[in-house]
Amino acid sequence: MINTRILNTLGLLLIFLGFTMLPSSLWSLYYQEYNDLFPILKSSLYTILFGFILYSSKYLNKAQNKTDFTSNDAFTIVTLGWFLSAIFGALPLYLSNYNISFIDCFFESMSGLTTTGATILGGSTISIESLSHGLLFW
């Protein structure tokens, strides 16, 4: 059984990620790109809600001991944290009207979060310059 403190930590990470999506919606508002405003806001809402669900898991098991995290817990948090961040970070691109596959959105999200700088956009599917300012800011 997974430690509820791990879920609690992952929930806090997703809540933070959801709030970091909100400034992108301000760019969409500023440039009046309403088609991409709502996917960004929905993605932020989904991420924050899922984060709260994970965070509230600490109330399910009140009898759990208050020991420190083990190294296995730390590896689990880091691995799942990167994976969940990339999945939820892909939502603004995936929910937009650009018809980008989820795998491509996941790659773009992971590349952006890790500051790799690699991109698959600009090939045969869609050019980077055609994306909205809000999505580019994200």
Describe the predicted segments one by one.
Residues 1-138:
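Membrane-proximal intracellular helices of multi-pass ion channels
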